[in-house]
């Protein structure tokens, strides 16, 4: 299945070695998808667990569609991942709630920052405090990203449920589309504002109750178009201000030169000046 909305996510290269491939083989693809779909991390009994898509129950059919394989293949991959302790799958009425064991998705950059700091900086009593502060800031940053996805998903659920007249929940693709919006830097409050505008615009156009917004991806383009237009407008305004300052500087320079020419006692002549005949 083609995915037009691709986005980067952090993982460790150690996962891509023969030890892991010997254990789980092609199931590694499903495991990587779980990592990319992790929306938050929790710690339980000293173990970090990555919560996949906010613990939305996933059906084998949904996961099979991601890779274009059969449901039987997905079930075999899930069994391998569970047996080798890569994931924990909890059966729910409408699918499986997946957790990634020893999740490091959101600590990836923090770890690199700390190791780099220890290598590059000389020891001083203040260094640990500075690094601790950096770790806290980084953790807060990724926690904020998780919360952003959850807030947007919650509002999308409310809007869709109101439109459908029944309770509906975001799909895995919805969560991925939301994560992309967060990743490109759209503020949560602005995302929710545009999301509401998107639903309102749809309501104004629809002619039948059966016409509803089925996926967040429909709203993604609406949000992205406005965000990029807003960014372009800001950049144009900044460029305009720079040009104005540049023009003012040039005008001041030219004015100064003109003043010098006007106050010359020789009228601009140089060399020997002949006396006027009377």
From Swiss-Prot:
Q: Which residues bind DNA?
A: 58-80
What are the entry keywords? Answer: DNA-binding
Region (Disordered) location: 117-136, 239-278
> In its UniProt entry, what is this protein called?
Phage-like element PBSX protein XkdB
Recite the lineage of the species. Answer: Bacteria, Bacillati, Bacillota, Bacilli, Bacillales
Locate the compositionally biased regions of type Basic and acidic residues: 248-263
GO molecular function terms noted in the UniProt entry? DNA binding
Q: Which domain of life is it from?
A: Bacteria
